Amino acid sequence: MLAKVYVTLKNGVLDPQGKAVHHAAETIGFNGIADVRQGKYFEIKLDGSLDETQARTHVEKFAHDVLSNPVIEDYKVEIATN
């Protein structure tokens, strides 16, 4: 089983890295990009000892407690069972 976790800054939180990437894109000719927000992506291989519901609960807690800063970041968890 594979868990995918996407961590992004909450709306309203300033994103200087995203702004820098947006500025660089415009500078080198990538026009038409309105905004860039940066984030983090994690792939977590699970050992199969948990069913899908347990795995989601386990990874959600891990994402909240370890992978993100809940004050300024949101996260999304996807579980792939193949």
Question: Each predicted region: which residue ranges?
Answer:
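Short Gly/Ser/Thr- and Asp/Glu-enriched loop/turn motifs at secondary-structure junctions
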Residues: R37-Y41
